[in-house]
Amino acid sequence: MAASELYTKFARVWIPDPEEVWKSAELLKDYKPGDKVLLLHLEEGKDLEYRLDPKTSELPHLRNPDILVGENDLTALSYLHEPAVLHNLRVRFIDSKLIYTYCGIVLVAINPYEQLPIYGEDIINAYSGQNMGDMDPHIFAVAEEAYKQMARDERNQSIIVSGESGAGKTVSAKYAMRYFATVSGSASEANVEEKVLASNPIMESIGNAKTTRNDNSSRFGKYIEIGFDKRYRIIGANMRTYLLEKSRVVFQAEEERNYHIFYQLCASAKLPEFKMLRLGNADSFHYTKQGGSPMIEGVDDAKEMAHTRQACTLLGISESYQMGIFRILAGILHLGNVGFASRDSDSCTIPPKHEPLIIFCDLMGVDYEEMCHWLCHRKLATATETYIKPISKLQATNARDALAKHIYAKLFNWIVGHVNQALHSAVKQHSFIGVLDIYGFETFEINSFEQFCINYANEKLQQQFNMHVFKLEQEEYMKEQIPWTLIDFYDNQPCINLIESKLGILDLLDEECKMPKGTDDTWAQKLYNTHLNKCALFEKPRMSNKAFIIKHFADKVEYQCEGFLEKNKDTVFEEQIKVLKSSKFKMLPELFQDDEKAISPTSATSSGRTPLTRVPVKPTKGRPGQTAKEHKKTVGLQFRNSLHLLMETLNATTPHYVRCIKPNDFKFPFTFDEKRAVQQLRACGVLETIRISAAGFPSRWTYQEFFSRYRVLMKQKDVLGDRKQTCQNVLEKLILDKDKYQFGKTKIFFRAGQVAYLEKLRADKLRAACIRIQKTIRGWLLRKRYLCMQRAAITVQRYVRGYQARCYAKFLRRTKAATTIQKYWRMYVVRRKYKIRRAATIVLQSYLRGYLARNRYRKILREHKAVIIQKRVRGWLARTHYKRTMKAIIYLQCCFRRMMAKRELKKLKIEARSVERYKKLHIGMENKIMQLQRKVDEQNKDYKCLMEKLTNLEGVYNSETEKLRNDVERLQLSEEEAKVATGRVLSLQEEIAKLRKDLEQTRSEKKSIEERADKYKQETEQLVSNLKEENTLLKQEKETLNHLMVEQAKEMTETMERKLVEETKQLELDLNDERLRYQNLLNEFSRLEERYDDLKEEMTLMLNVPKPGHKRTDSTHSSNESEYTFSSEFAETEDIAPRTEEPTEKKVPLDMSLFLKLQKRVTELGQEKQLMQDELDRKEEQVLRSKAKGGERPQIRGAELGYESLKRQELESENKKLKNELNELRKALSEKSAPEVNAPGAPAYRVLMEQLTAVSEELDVRKEEVLILRSQLVSQKEAIQPKDDKNTMTDSTILLEDVQKMKDKGEIAQAYIGLKETNRLLESQLQSQKRSHENEAEALRGEIQSLKEENNRQQQLLAQNLQLPPEARIEASLQHEITRLTNENLDLMEQLEKQDKTVRKLKKQLKVFAKKIGELEVGQMENISPGQIIDEPIRPVNIPRKGKDFQGMLEYKREDEQKLVKNLILELKPRGVAVNLISGLPAYILFMCVRHADYLDDDQKVRSLLTSTINSIKKVLKKRGDDFETVSFWLSNTCRFLHCLKQYSGEEGFMKHNTSRQNEHCLTNFDLAEYRQVLSDLAIQIYQQLVRVLENILQPMIVSGMLEHETIQGVSGVKPTGLRKRTSSIADEGTYTLDSILRQLNSFHSVMCQHGMDPELIKQVVKQMFYIVGAITLNNLLLRKDMCSWSKGMQIRYNVSQLEEWLRDKNLMNSGAKETLEPLIQAAQLLQVKKKTDDDAEAICSMCNALTTAQIVKVLNLYTPVNEFEERVSVSFIRTIQVRLRDRKDSPQLLMDAKHIFPVTFPFNPSSLALETIQIPASLGLGFIARV
């Protein structure tokens, strides 16, 4: 069909827009050929008349159907053009948050400016091994494709990463290298992948800088070759760099920085090791402050410096070299601060003692004067003379900057060289993958030499890219055998010729650089003369003579000629370099070793420093003028040569392209600027790829997919059995132009737009069918609805009319009744009102009259009381006046009497003074005295009588007074009562009158009260009835409340049970976590063991050491010994000496055990020697003290002390000797790691045996010496007794004589022997008593401690109980008592069990001993039997016994152990054993052998057998670890062996299910609990290996069977994609289906059942298998946009139901396997539910509790409708989901950990099989073992 036919009404198109680049619009009417205007409707609601170009009449680009928007591959779009590409990228980037998109063979990566969780190890594992087209676009997919193609095609690969600065090139390259490092691993002993990754921080610090476009912009290009060996493991890497931006060292634009390393140095200046560099803030250096932006937000330069140093250390750059690098970098910074002062216009100088220059010279180790001179001067050389010429300040500054740039460039190259040296490998490189991180096409306002080189490189890369794309397109057409014509594509060879051909731009530039007076202007004129108007790609700007324009493949670029020559020459003065070469700093001359001799036009040197000096030059011995003619290569030439080498490398590899796009210039996250994106798409070749694809057949369908999609366009008669012929017939009818499509072998190829046309036909057909279906259904529904409404209306009318008639009759009855009721009611109301008013009036009257009477009474009473008060007051006033008057009279009398008394006193005093008065008075005084005396006596008597009378009278008076007072009070009370009675009488009279009146009123009110009572009675009855009803309701409510309480109690019980279950689950989770950590450690340990073995093998191969056959390596020995060797509790240390005499054919583990025991014995000897030494020291102190007291015994004491010191020295020398011998032994054992070292006869073995013999002999000698020394100490104690000074010499002499006599007679030896025996006996008794006392003391201490703890607990409990209420206190005390009794009961039970075990063990030993005694008795009887001939040998004959009672043991000889292990483990075929014999037979045989060794009490035999068994199982699994049947077999047997060790261990917990006969088979001598733990660890390792095996088998099936295969045919509609799949990296091994997975699961299950694996263990394996299936399926679903659809959700749900059915068939529903599929089930449900409203969001949040928030959002973002009738998930709905899930606490991880292994447990499963019934089949080849 014609293209114009697609421009119909409602068709959507793209029109150009100055702001948005392209804008979408919709046609309002059909387009007809010849129309000049299109009526469009824009998306913002405006109408537009779009005028077509009259010259070309080109129609606007058509927009793709919405179903195609958001495709993974841009070439899958039906319409391939710029607006479609731009829109698709924008939708994926903004709406779906997807930064990667394919464009044919190109991966387009848009920088999100945000950290995304899509680069973790789980994502790497998900992409590993997958086809590139099967997964969503990702840098890991490109890396995986390169890695697989390298392995499949045996061809080197390249990944070319390009883009603008800030587009993310470096990050993409870094992630690609991380992918290779993760999936491949390294082949050498060092982690090469870590070194490759460690090179990134180093290169970023010295080669990256902050620019206005990027905070971490790479200012150089690099190509990293990652080398692989034949096994495709990383062995090394090599890096090439291109065009370092040296000018940044000395100059930075605004808001930019120098290289990161300078700022890292300044940030770390305060470190102690950096003090010598004398650095400071970055703002204090000229080379780091020009940009004005020394800090980067979010970046800590000090931490980055630490990372850089760590990376240097990892790459082998020593600390001294690192400090040398930092020293040179610091010198560059100080060099930038060197300033110049102008002396005149042609010369300059440096200030004296200039500090920056001094620091620079100190750091560089050069002479200050020389450097100062050559910074201000230069040499000019002629043929015979050399001139030293001063330079101006500007020239000196430029020379300083050139020197700084040159030093930095040399340092950069030196570091790159050392990095390459560190990454180099001695192993031969088999292949490599190169990662090219190169600058993209650049165009700025001012473009210079750097942009010219960058764009030149991009021209070369674009040419290579176009050729590769074109080649792939043509190869696809040829493969499908379709006719094709040559695709026209842009060839940029003319532009490359313009740059690099002879007389090209670079050639003219180099030629101009050779000219003595060449300038940028002359070079520009040569360009104009050579290329202007001769080359269509070269232009001259109109307004400039110093610029030129080149038409590159991406855009026109105008270059400014200024600076081209200088940058191309890269000139630096040789004299300055020579000064640096003469440095004392050794590292600095290394940087300039490769410099060419002619750095500047002059090469001679001179020491003169005059402003202009002519110096005669003697000709050198070499060729005259040689150095003057030599020139170094220009920068352009070097760059061109390196670029040619790069292109040769890339052309020899298979390229993979990554184009990085910068979405905006402001680094805003997920913000898309269409203008900038279009510029970069044009520049990076993406649109060229689209154009090449669109020129051919971009859309490709297989015949089956085309038939499935467009079956609706076919009639029944068109459908044939041959799908290919059917598709051809239909296409010929649908598309008349046969050039629009081609039929290939397996695919149909369509031109651009044809798929959209087919989609339009399909949509029209489906729309017409939908309209017809809707029309029919709507008519049927309306007709059905009308009939239903008619029947309903008639029925409603009938019921309504009847209802109206009944209502009218009821109305009449109610009206009549209402009239009668109203009559009686009105009468009743009026009568009631009258009665109420009358009663109220009477009540008011009564109350009013009573009120008036009471007022009158209160008035009279007040008047009466006022009179009484007046009376009392007047009497009181009169009495008061009388008392005051009497008081005044008495006072006057007193005053008068006092005056008279004073007068009389005065008179008496005067009389008393006269003598005559005394005389008169004395006359007759005596008689008077006598008389007066008598009178006094009489008066005293009278006085006494009167006093008695007075006392009596007072008593009488008091009693009378009291009576009178009482009478007065009684009278007063009577008076008051009388008054009250009088008032009461009056009031009673008034009340009587009042009561009479009230009585009358009461009688009148009685009637009304009776009436009210009747009414109240009625109301009460009504109230009672109401109360009864309320009571009934309350009873019902009570019952309801009781029921509610029961339910609440039940609910509380359920809640408590639920909480208990939750806590139990939490504890189980904690236990599983702990198990998982432990098993992960075991897994890591086994992995490290394997790695160690691999490394050791490689080391052996590298060192060419012949590997002896069947000998254990040292590593195996050490690991086995450390893991499995332990000392039995029944082994005794006295067995050491006999074991040393065993044959030398002992195994190495036994030798090592002897060595350990020997070392232990030496330690014991050392301790014993130390005790003896301490005792000797104490005795020596006692001797010294006694010597100080007794000075007359020096000779004897000196001799004794000398003897003791001599013995001590001998002991010390012997101890040193033992230590030396032990060290020699250790050295001999550790000198070599070869296996023969520990073999019998080896030097280490001989040394071991000799030392063992010597130590056993020394042991006896030392014991005797100990006894001798102790006896001497005893004799010394007896000798040192306080004696008299006189007898000292005599006693000592006698003592010496006695000793001499005893020596002569030989009695001393006998005394010594007796004393020694006595001391031994006493010593043993003392030691036993000491031990018993210590044990008793320890027991008492433990009891005291337990009592203290119990006391503390009781005190704490008492303190807690005192704070509780009484009920709780009682309950707490009871609880404590119960707990205490329970604990005591448990302790007693434990003691009882221990005693029972001891009794059983003793009984068994008794039986064994009794049997041995019986056998010995029988042997003795046979030996003494008559007729026996001793000399004649008799051949032994085996006589079988009839009905022998076997004990369930197998006897074997020690030398047959290796044969047993070989036949039973190493060479055993699991299939034959599992099919023909009982399950677990090897485990039973091994245990029966262990039982016999236990029966013999042979510790060594048990240890050797168990160690050999474990090592042999490991060896078998290492050899055949990929065979599921082998791993399953040995997992089953290992578990059975472990269960046997438990079942027959003799422990009570494992003997519950045993028979009495089985209990007799328990082990008697050894406790193998430690070996049970070792076997458990081994079983865990085997289980983990089993999981890895089944994962490797299942993994290729899962994605195909669970996702890709259509189990329900016809449900999934094929999307109209372009089907531009990448070439599969994995060979097509056939399509797996769900049935394949189920068959494999059946195979696994049957094998495990045949091997007799425990049912619980089978459940755990099945659970792990289902987890792997669910995790891998979900991970692929989350990474594949094409799988996220409604129909795919139905397929997944059906597949999961089939897996559940399999679980039901195998009775494994309770294994927990179904729960592991819950995330997958919820993801399938999420694909099927509605996703529009808030209610849908709420339902999704509650439904998807097993999915994380990231997974839910990812699925919603990836959801893609299969056809256009479905709607996409809106962005607002996804945001609603995110808001609702914001508070959910789950992992931010996107993918499930497919490598996760659930912790495994081995529940005890005893066997009912009796050991004595087991027969050994002859097929096992175990004839050398015998049943016992």
Curated annotation (Swiss-Prot):
Reaction(s) the record says it catalyses: ATP + H2O = ADP + phosphate + H(+)
Residues involved in ATP binding: 163-170
Residues the record lists as N-acetylalanine modifications: 2
Domain Myosin N-terminal SH3-like: residue ranges: 8-60
Matching Gene3D superfamilies: 1.10.10.820, 1.20.5.190, 1.20.58.530, 3.30.70.1590, Kinesin motor domain (3.40.850.10), Myosin VI head, motor domain, U50 subdomain (1.20.120.720)
GO cellular component terms, semicolon-separated: actin cytoskeleton; actin filament; actomyosin; actomyosin, myosin complex part; axon; cytoplasm; cytosol; dendrite
Domain Myosin motor: residue ranges: 69-763
Entries under SMART domains matching the protein: DIL, IQ, MYSc
Keyword tags: Acetylation, Actin-binding, ATP-binding, Calmodulin-binding, Coiled coil, Motor protein, Myosin, Nucleotide-binding, Phosphoprotein, Protein transport, Repeat, Transport
GO molecular function, one term: ATP hydrolysis activity
Residues in the signal sequence: none
Modification type Phosphoserine: residues: 600, 1425, 1625
Bias kind Basic and acidic residues: ranges: 1136-1147
Role: Processive actin-based motor that can move in large steps approximating the 36-nm pseudo-repeat of the actin filament. Can hydrolyze ATP in the presence of actin, which is essential for its function as a motor protein. Involved in melanosome transport. Also mediates the transport of vesicles to the plasma membrane. May also be required for some polarization process involved in dendrite formation.
Family named by the database record: Belongs to the TRAFAC class myosin-kinesin ATPase superfamily. Myosin family.
Disease linked to the protein: Defects in Myo5a are a cause of Dilute-opisthotonus (dop). Dop rats have diluted coat color and are occasionally associated with severe neurological disorders.
Protein name as annotated: Unconventional myosin-Va
Biological classification of the source: Eukaryota, Metazoa, Chordata, Craniata, Vertebrata
